[in-house]
Swiss-Prot record:
Chain spans, region Interaction with tRNA: 137-139, 296-297
Function: Catalyzes the 2-thiolation of uridine at the wobble position (U34) of tRNA, leading to the formation of s(2)U34.
Protein name (record): tRNA-specific 2-thiouridylase MnmA 3
Gene: mnmA3
BP terms from Gene Ontology: tRNA wobble position uridine thiolation
Top-rank lineage group of the source organism: Bacteria
Molecular-function GO term, any one: ATP binding
Organism whose genome encodes this protein: Bacteroides thetaiotaomicron (strain ATCC 29148 / DSM 2079 / JCM 5827 / CCUG 10774 / NCTC 10582 / VPI-5482 / E50)
Entry keyword set: ATP-binding, Cytoplasm, Disulfide bond, Nucleotide-binding, RNA-binding, Transferase, tRNA processing, tRNA-binding
Disulfide bond positions: C91-C188
Subcellular location: Cytoplasm
Length: 362
């Protein structure tokens, strides 16, 4: 009879990180079951061959249709709405870890493991996500939406490693060719520019939305753009407009198909609204003296304070100015390296009145 509490289901892409994860867990005495989610592209031949070499069970979960109907659709819809999505943040709870949990239950595996560069810490009855030791590879930012039920089953073996050490480990274990492979794509279903992907998947963008106007903060037209979905807050390159000085995207209005341009100073803000949050312990978040927030992947955490508004949203006050706050991106809150929770950056419309009403309460 198989010992369930030693069976681990590993999300196995066939890349460097999932290969190292399998080998490390095997060394620790776990029985490994590999599942490769096919969400885009070709058959996962690499993963099959690696599983055979390691002598582990391997299955392929063909999730191409539901992945396209949920994650890819959301990605396109967010850009249509003038927001800047992060598909990994959406995928992890809605898709990746949900599917892995379903397969783990089906295959009688107690645990789920992935090659994320993050750690877990149990404190006061809660499981917290903790930033991985490799600051350049840390993926805690992408995991804030995972619930306690999933985190209790998760193992992240690479959290204590740097990418260099993982490559060295694979080479030592006889996987030298694998250790020299390049990095995986940042967004698994996009090769190249996301704008080309939008046009390919949603050709009506150019016919139904089409070109619109760049405007300044007074609403004066500055020139034409290719369509609001093709721009992001803070963007400077690729605007294809000459104003005699550097210009940045300040706001996007999908209803009017306008893109507001301005200078770098106009991107600065001391406040931000966030919504659809998941917080581990609200009392801890609101009272934390060392609280800091990341407003995009790999950005430096900015010291802040947070308040819950009556409408359920969060008002974040930065202790130093932040730049290019982009609706749709994630705001992930940290106490040191420990994730206390996260939220989606909301539309900042009407924030002036909110600030006036709450300025003395933060």
């Amino acid at each position: 009879m198989k010992e369930r509490n030693k069976r681990v289901l590993v999300g196995m892409s066939g890349g460097i990180d999932s290969t190292a994860t399998c080998l490390m867990l095997q060394e620790q005495g776990y029985e490994i079951v590999g599942v490769t989610m096919r969400v885009w592209g070709d058959e996962p031949q690499d993963a099959r061959e690696l599983a055979a070499r390691m002598g582990i069970e391997h299955y392929v979960a063909d999730e191409r249709i539901p992945f396209k109907e949920t994650i890819v659709k959301n990605f396109i819809d967010e850009y249509k709405q003038g927001r800047t999505p992060n598909p990994c943040v959406m995928c992890n709870p809605l898709f990746k870890f949900r599917v892995l949990a379903e397969w783990a239950d089906k295959l009688d595996c107690a645990y789920i493991a992935t090659g994320h560069y993050s750690r877990l810490e149990e404190r006061s009855g809660h499981i917290y996500i903790v930033a991985g030791d490799d600051d350049k590879k840390d993926q805690s930012y992408f995991l804030w939406r995972l619930g306690q039920d999933i985190l209790k089953r998760c193992i992240f073996p690479l959290g204590d490693y740097t990418k260099i050490k993982v490559r060295e480990y694979l080479a030592e274990k006889g996987y030298e060719a694998k250790s020299k492979e390049g990095e995986s794509m940042e967004v698994c279903f996009i090769q190249g520019d996301y704008r080309d992907f939008l046009r390919e998947q949603c050709p009506e963008l150019d016919t139904e939305i089409g070109p619109g106007w760049f405007v300044n903060s007074e609403g004066v037209k500055l020139g034409q753009h290719k369509g609001a979905p093709y721009y992001t807050i803070g963007q400077r390159k690729g605007l294809e407009i000459a104003l005699g000085k550097p210009a940045y995207v300040l706001k996007i209005n999908p209803q009017k198909n306008t893109v507001m341009l301005g200078d770098a100073e106009q991107l600065q803000t001391e406040y931000m609204l966030a919504e659809q949050d998941r917080i581990v312990d609200e009392q801890e978040l609101f009272s934390c003296e060392n609280l800091a927030v990341r407003i995009r992947y790999r950005s430096r955490p900015i010291p802040c304070r947070v308040k819950r508004l009556e409408d359920g949203r969060l008002l974040v006050r930065f202790r130093e100015t932040a730049s290019a706050v982009a609706p749709g991106q994630s705001a992930v809150f940290y106490d040191g390296r420990r994730v206390l929770g996260g939220a989606f950056i909301a539309s900042q419309r009407g924030i002036g009145l909110v600030i006036i009403e709450n300025k003395d309460k933060l």
